[in-house]
Every structure is written in C-alpha cells, then in structure tokens.
C-alpha cells in the first residue's frame, strides 16, 4: 500500500470511489436525494479542480485506488486549514486506512502551518474524526444545513 499525491489521471477512479462509498457506506445516514446531490459535486472535473488548491492524496493497493483525502487552506487563510474528500473504499474500511490518510494529511505543510484545522464531517464519519482529536466547532454537536458536522482541531505552534 502506498500513499501518493493525486494526479489528473486519478480523477475518474477517485470520483467513482467517492460516489460508490457515499452510496454504500453513507446511505444509512443520508437520503437518496442528498446522495444524488452530493454525486453531482463529486465528478472527475470536481476532483481535478479541488487538486488545484489543495494537496490531494490517494491510497493505492496493488495499483487500485482504495482511498483519498485532501487538505487545503480554510477560505484562503494562512493560519487555518481544512480537510476534504476523505474516503476509503467500503471493502477496506476498518483496516486503519482512514487513520493513515489523516496521519498523512497531518504531516502536510497546510496542516503544519495551521493553528486550526476544520473538517466538514459526515454523520457517518463524525465518531471516527472525534477519536482522532477533532471536536465539535463552537461546541455545536449537530449537523448543519448541509447535514455535515463541523469539527475542528487546534494546534499550538510558534508560527505567527
């Protein structure tokens, strides 16, 4: 298994992975309408666009993409970052791959320069992120209007 940076050639496979995971794993927490709307925002062109302003990673096992995740600036901030598109293929869930993706993102320069990191967490994944030290933003422990939990982690650094 290797973790490497996303390339444009990965866009189709990453899009398919994300959509399949939403339909398989997240379907217990979200309506079909919500998942269909999400699918429209997870097309290959969306993955390519996301990679222009984030550091986007993929996880490969025997040349098959089995996971992905990205980190980038939070609304252009130099001191805040956000995690995006963290997905693991349903067959590989529960095997530590999601944790490896988070560890990779937490070693990225966008994480290391940030004092605060935010993640829009699905209902399905909120407990996973909480185990890794992310807590409810402003203490709000319910989904927002997008049906996502807003989680955050603070880093105490010497950065200005």
Model-derived segments and their meaning:
Residues 42-58, 82:
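A short helix-loop-beta-strand connector motif used in the catalytic cores of GNAT acetyltransferases and
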Residues 109-122:
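Conserved GNAT acetyl-CoA-binding A-motif
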Residues 19-45:
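Conserved GNAT-fold acetyl-CoA-binding loop/helix
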Residues 2-16:
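A short beta-loop-alpha structural element at the N-terminal edge
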Residues 88, 94-107, 131:
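Conserved acetyl-CoA-binding loop-helix of GNAT-fold acetyltransferases
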Residues 73-84, 93, 112, 143-148:
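A conserved beta-turn-beta hairpin within the catalytic core of GNAT-like acetyltransferases
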């Amino acid at each position: 298994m290797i973790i490497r940076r996303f390339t444009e050639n990965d866009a189709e496979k990453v899009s398919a992975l994300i959509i399949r995971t939403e339909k398989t794993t997240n379907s217990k927490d979200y309506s079909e309408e919500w998942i269909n709307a999400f699918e429209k925002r997870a097309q290959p062109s969306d993955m390519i666009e996301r990679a222009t302003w984030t550091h986007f990673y993929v996880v490969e096992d025997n040349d098959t993409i089995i996971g992905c995740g990205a980190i980038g600036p939070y609304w252009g901030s130099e001191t805040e970052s956000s995690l995006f598109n963290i997905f693991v293929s349903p067959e590989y869930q529960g095997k530590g791959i999601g944790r490896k993706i988070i560890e990779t993102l937490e070693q990225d320069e966008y994480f290391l320069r940030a004092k605060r990191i935010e993640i829009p967490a699905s209902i399905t994944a909120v407990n996973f992120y909480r185990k890794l030290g992310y807590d409810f933003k402003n203490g709000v422990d319910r989904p927002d209007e997008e049906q996502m939990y807003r989680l955050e982690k603070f880093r105490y650094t010497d950065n200005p």
